Structure formats: structure tokens, C-alpha cells
């Protein structure tokens, strides 16, 4: 990295010349050194079909660059113009009720429609040709927030592509029928063309149909990203990304497979700071070895016509920025620079108001810039320490849980809650996609992944055999790749590999079921598995409710390491304490060295450089915190010596400690 970026999303096409110049001047004063432009400007670039002119944006990029501000240019494909959509319902997105989306509000077109793909390729080619080699253009963003407002499309184009996808996957219809078990409810198909989309139906569609359609849709949107990236690379060497999210119906691992760096948006409040940190720990690993970007976060609050959050507490924005840079980000950017005077998001927080004055978040933006300048030399001379503990993250698992949410489960909430238990123990951690290598890790958690591929099981079991500890569950391994039930044993290949026998799987009632582990008794909930206590070493036993007397937490030696099966989810305060005790127990057994006793609400981001180990300590919750320094070190901000022992951190404060004897 050559610099840290501090930026904003900017829409010069919405403003007159005088306002644009005012914006650029104030950006320089604030310290904004990058902007993102163009993602919603298709009708400005091509007001009439076939009449494309991107000269305005060429001029803007040049003017910004002359003022020391670099640009990430976007393709404008979320917002096809009215000439594309008017009177052409076949080009539009159809939701699961087969309702056709109208023009406007963005993402109204079906991204699989062949005419959309054709026009998207033409506008992308024109932009890349004209702007691709400009000085000041440092990157490309494809589209914006794929599937933000929509999920799977049910139009006729998608139906045809769905049938093609099924043919490629199964070859002959008999294989599909066998794999899905379509004899249920007389659902057997005679041709691929008979397989429906999971649209309106009297009751629930078949699990296999619902999950496979989601996976099909995820592959289709990724193929659109591939197509756009390929076009841009013909005319530009600048790296390509997409502004993604874990909230949407996409497979981010697949989406970023052919892109150059990972980026996303997050609007986590101070009360939900763990979600902000989760994103940093995940997106750092989607393109390993490359810094990630936060392309959108609010300088104060998020809002639309129908909802609004509250402004951040003073200091929280700085804590977000410093923690993101410390955890591997190169860019920290706001949505948006100047409040929009019209549209659906006129009430959204911004850096400047629509009338050009500082907003409620302005002083916090200035604080971020002061912090960026202060820590930039440290960040540029170090890199994040390799974590020794990892947690598996899977967007494909999200599809399975969307199909089968049991009692209203949400994948994101499950993952965030489990992540918080690891975070609260002070362990430096990674969230890694299913396909990530396990080199360098000692401890692996794999919760909430209903289907585990054979490839993943082989990789994770090899990790355990070589000395790692693999903790799997809850809600893991109980479904096949087709979203059917195993017929050989409860958890299929996972059970066979671990050697731990599953006795029953059933929904535990946390008002009835309790279990005990690590000296803690807690309610148990979620769709659960209980295990034969003779097939492994029992660490947790169901004490009350169905399954009482059987193990819900058990381990078994596997080569030089262990496989641990967590069959149920401890809940409530006692459950959180039990899970954190589990994390600490196995972190000690795995000899995790990259950890601290930092108080909850404060984080330690360890970094390493030529001069050794650096801890960047940041308070996120606004309550202040502390951590024990294992040895003496130098505060790189004050240049004072800090002795080994307790280090206090004030509300939203950050400290940077270079250890004297640690490398």
C-alpha cells in the first residue's frame, strides 16, 4: 500500500458547476483523497438509447485529480434508463410472487435478460475505453450492492436459464429426480423444462428446488460480474471490485473469485459494533493478502424515506475507521458526500448538507482524517498478524438456512452471535470462506453450515489430523448437497469422519432443555443433535428435556488433533458464558498465542512489521476498556514507554503499542 484512503461516494451529475467546485474545495479541506462516482448515472451517460457520452465524468476525474483526489469509477448498471424499461416488462425483475418490478428505485431490471446484458456491455465498454487509462482513476466498482433490494428473479429469461443450469448439473432428468427425491407429493419430472421456479404455490416448495434455485441465482449474478470485469480489463489495468454485503442473496466467495480486491458497505451502530468487526475479519480474507475497502458507511446515520437510524455517538466513527485500517482496510468511505436534494434517500446522513453546510457528522469526519494521518505510517509499515483461530463463513449455507429457517432463524444473526463469543475472548480471529486454505491456523470453528462438502471435510479433517482442533456445529452437516436428509447416519460424512455417533436430531426448546458443560448450566435451543457418549469424550450433557442424559458436546482425538462436535446452541447469558468457556478451553489447548485479555467492547488488532509486533487497541463501545500488555512497549503516538501490565483505553480512544522485545 502507498497510502490510506479516506473518501466518499459523490454524485456530481446531480449538481451545478458552482456546487461541484465548492464540493472539491471542501473535500481538500476535509482531507478526502478518493471518491466513488457513476454507479447510478446511466441516464446521464446515455440519455437516449445509443447516444453515449461520458465526457462529463472524464472532466470530473481530471478536476478531482488536479486537486489531489483519486477516483473509483463505477459501472452504472443498477439503474437502466427509462428507454430500456418503458413498455418492456420482459426485461424487468420478477419477484417470488412473479410481480413485475416497475421502473426506478434501482435494480428493476433482470440482470440475466439478454438485452440488459447487451446494453450493459455496451455502456461498460464505452466507459472503460474513454476513462480506463486516466491518471487519477485508481479502481473500478462493478454495479452496486448486487441483490440489495431483490433476491431471485422469476422471469421467463431466468426460467430458461434455470433449465439450462439444471441440465448442466444433472445431465438427465432421472438424476435430478433421484437426487431431489421427487417422489414426494408426486413431484417427479419427465423433462427439465417441467421443473418450475419456486414461485407462488399453495404450500412450501420442495427444499431441493428452493435451495438449488438460490444457488443458480448466485451463480448467474457472479457471471454478470465476470462479464463486466472482462470488458474493463480490455481497456484498463486498474483493479476491479464490487461493493458487496453479507446481507444480500449472493455468494461472495464466488463473486470475488475473478475480481481484484474485496470491498463492501456496513452501517453498524455502536450497539452493534461486533457486526462492524465481523465484516472486517471476513472481507480481509475474501481476497487474502490484499487490503479490503469499506466503500460505504454513514458519517452519522443511515436513513431512507421510511426509516432512519440515530446519529453515531461522537467518537464512534473514528473508532470504526481506526479499527478497520488496523484490521486490514486500505479505504474508509462514506455514503455520501453531499446530501441528495431529491429521491428516496433524501434524509440519509452525509458529510455536507444539500445546502452545502457541515452536517451533524462533520466534526467526526475531521476526527477520522486526523486519525488517518496519525496512524498511516504505522499501517503502511506493518500488516495484520496471521490469525491462529478461524471461523468458517458460507453464503451457500445462508441459502440452506433461508430455505429451512426452522423457527425463524436468520443466518446473519446466528453467525454474528457466535462470532461475538470468539471476539469477547480476546482471540485474534479470521472469518474465512469455505474454499480458503487452513494453513497457519490451530483452531477452526464451523457452525451453521448445514451442508459440508466432501472437499471441505477432507480439508478440515486433514487439518485436525495434523494437530488442529476442529469444532463443528451446531446446525452443521445434517443436510446433503441437494438439501435432503442423510439416509446412512444423522450427519453423513461428517459423522463418519469424526467417529462420533449421532443418536437423535430434533428441535430443542430452550424453555425446557438445559445442558451442562465447563461447570455451567444453560438453556439449549436450535435444531440439535445429541451423541452417543461412548463414541467420544463427553464435555457437555443434556440435563433436562428431551435427550436428557445424552451428550450435546463431545470430542474425539483425530490424528494429532481433535474433532469436536457441538450439537446444540447454548442460549441466554449462561449460554454465552458456556460458549466463551468452550472457546477459551480449546484456545488454550491449541496454544493460541495471538490473544489478549482485552475487555469486551474494546479490541486488539495485532500487526507485524520490520520492527516487530504492534498492537492497535481501540475502544468501540464508548465505555472505555483495558488490556494487559504482556511486556513493555513504546506508545508510537506519544513515544512514551508503557510498562508491562494493565493499559487503560478511554471511550473511543485508540492506542498503538510497539513491543520492545517481541518479533
Swiss-Prot record:
One of its GO terms (molecular function) is beta-galactosidase activity. The keyword Metal-binding applies. Induction: Up-regulated by growth on type I rhamnogalacturonan. Changing residue 145 to A: Hydrolysis of the covalent glycosyl-enzyme intermediate is slowed. Substrate binds at residues 106, 144, 345-348. GO terms for biological process: galactose metabolic process. GO terms for cellular component: beta-galactosidase complex. PANTHER family: BETA-GALACTOSIDASE GANA, BETA-GALACTOSIDASE YESZ. Homotrimer. May play a role in the degradation of rhamnogalacturonan derived from plant cell walls. Belongs to the glycosyl hydrolase 42 family. This is Beta-galactosidase YesZ. The gene is yesZ.
Amino acid at each position: 500500500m502507498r497510502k490510506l484512503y479516506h473518501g466518499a461516494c459523490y454524485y456530481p451529475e446531480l449538481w451545478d458547476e458552482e456546487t461541484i467546485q465548492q464540493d472539491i474545495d471542501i473535500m481538500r479541506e476535509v482531507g478526502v483523497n478518493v471518491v466513488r462516482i457513476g454507479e447510478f448515472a446511466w441516464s446521464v451517460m446515455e440519455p437516449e438509447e445509443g447516444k453515449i457520452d461520458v465526457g462529463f465524468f472524464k472532466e470530473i476525474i481530471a478536476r478531482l485529480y488536479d486537486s489531489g483526489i483519486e477516483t473509483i469509477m463505477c459501472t452504472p448498471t443498477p439503474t437502466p434508463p427509462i428507454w430500456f424499461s418503458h413498455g418492456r416488462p420482459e426485461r424487468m425483475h420478477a419477484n417470488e410472487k412473479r410481480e413485475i418490478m416497475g421502473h426506478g428505485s434501482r435494480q428493476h431490471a433482470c440482470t440475466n435478460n439478454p438485452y440488459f446484458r447487451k446494453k450493459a456491455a455496451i455502456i461498460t465498454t464505452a466507459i472503460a475505453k474513454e476513462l480506463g487509462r486516466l491518471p487519477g482513476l485508481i479502481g473500478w466498482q462493478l454495479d452496486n450492492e448486487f441483490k440489495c433490494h431483490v433476491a431471485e428473479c422469476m422471469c421467463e429469461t431466468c426460467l430458461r436459464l434455470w433449465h439450462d443450469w439444471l441440465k448442466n448439473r444433472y445431465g438427465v432428468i432421472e438424476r435430478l429426480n433421484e437426487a431431489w427425491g421427487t417422489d414426494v407429493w408426486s413431484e417427479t419430472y419427465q423433462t427439465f423444462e417441467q421443473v418450475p421456479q419456486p414461485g407462488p404455490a399453495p404450500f412450501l416448495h420442495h427444499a431441493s428446488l428452493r435451495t438449488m434455485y438460490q444457488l443458480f441465482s448466485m451463480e448467474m449474478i457472479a457471471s454478470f460480474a465476470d462479464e463486466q470485469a472482462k470488458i474493463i480489463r480490455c481497456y484498463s489495468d486498474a483493479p476491479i471490485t464490487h461493493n458487496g454485503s453479507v446481507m444480500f442473496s449472493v455468494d461472495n466467495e464466488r463473486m470475488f473469485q475473478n475480481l481484484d480486491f474485496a470491498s463492501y458497505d456496513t452501517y453498524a451502530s455502536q450497539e452493534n459494533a461486533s457486526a462492524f468487526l465481523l465484516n472486517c475479519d471476513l472481507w480481509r480474507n475474501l481476497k487474502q493478502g490484499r487490503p479490503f475497502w469499506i466503500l460505504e458507511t454513514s458519517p452519522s446515520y443511515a436513513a431512507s424515506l421510511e426509516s432512519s437510524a440515530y446519529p453515531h455517538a461522537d467518537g464512534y466513527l473514528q473508532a470504526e475507521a481506526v479499527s478497520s485500517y488496523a484490521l486490514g482496510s486500505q479505504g474508509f468511505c462514506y455514503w455520501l458526500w453531499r446530501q441528495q436534494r431529491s429521491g428516496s434517500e433524501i434524509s440519509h446522513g452525509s458529510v455536507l448538507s444539500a445546502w452545502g453546510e457541515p452536517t451533524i457528522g462533520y466534526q467526526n469526519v475531521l476526527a477520522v482524517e486526523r486519525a488517518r494521518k496519525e496512524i498511516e505510517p504505522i499501517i503502511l509499515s506493518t500488516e495484520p498478524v496471521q490469525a491462529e483461530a478461524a471461523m468458517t463463513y458460507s453464503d451457500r449455507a445462508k441459502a440452506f438456512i433461508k430455505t429451512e429457517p426452522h423457527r425463524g432463524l436468520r443466518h446473519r444473526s446466528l453467525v454474528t452471535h457466535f462470532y461475538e463469543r470468539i471476539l469477547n475472548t480476546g482471540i485474534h480471529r479470521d472469518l474465512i470462506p469455505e474454499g480458503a486454505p487452513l494453513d497457519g491456523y490451530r483452531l477452526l470453528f464451523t457452525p451453521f453450515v448445514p451442508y459440508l462438502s466432501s472437499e471441505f471435510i477432507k480439508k478440515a479433517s486433514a487439518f485436525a489430523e495434523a494437530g488442529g482442533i476442529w469444532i463443528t456445529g451446531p446446525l452443521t452437516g445434517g443436510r446433503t448437497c441437494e438439501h435432503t436428509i442423510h439416509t446412512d447416519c444423522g450427519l453423513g460424512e461428517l459423522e463418519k469422519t469424526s467417529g462420533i455417533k449421532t443418536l437423535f436430531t430434533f428441535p430443542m426448546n430452550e424453555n425446557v432443555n438445559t445442558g451442562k458443560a465447563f461447570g455451567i448450566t444453560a438453556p439449549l435451543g436450535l435444531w440439535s443433535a445429541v451423541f452417543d457418549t461412548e463414541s467420544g469424550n463427553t464435555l457437555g450433557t443434556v440435563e433436562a428435556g428431551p435427550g436428557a442424559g445424552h451428550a450435546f458436546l463431545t470430542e474425539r482425538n483425530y490424528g494429532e488433533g481433535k474433532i469436536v462436535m457441538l450439537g446444540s446452541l447454548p442460549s441466554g447469558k449462561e449460554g454465552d458464558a458456556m460458549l466463551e468457556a468452550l472457546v477459551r478451553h480449546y484456545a488454550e489447548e491449541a496454544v493460541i498465542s495471538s490473544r489478549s485479555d482485552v475487555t469486551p467492547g474494546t479490541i486488539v488488532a495485532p500487526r507485524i512489521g520490520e520492527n516487530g509486533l504492534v498492537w492497535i487497541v481501540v475502544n468501540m463501545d464508548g465505555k472505555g476498556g483495558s488490556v494487559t500488555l504482556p511486556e513493555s512497549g513504546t506508545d508510537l503516538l506519544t513515544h512514551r514507554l508503557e510498562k508491562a501490565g494493565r493499559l487503560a483505553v478511554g471511550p473511543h480512544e485508540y492506542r498503538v503499542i510497539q513491543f520492545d522485545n517481541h518479533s
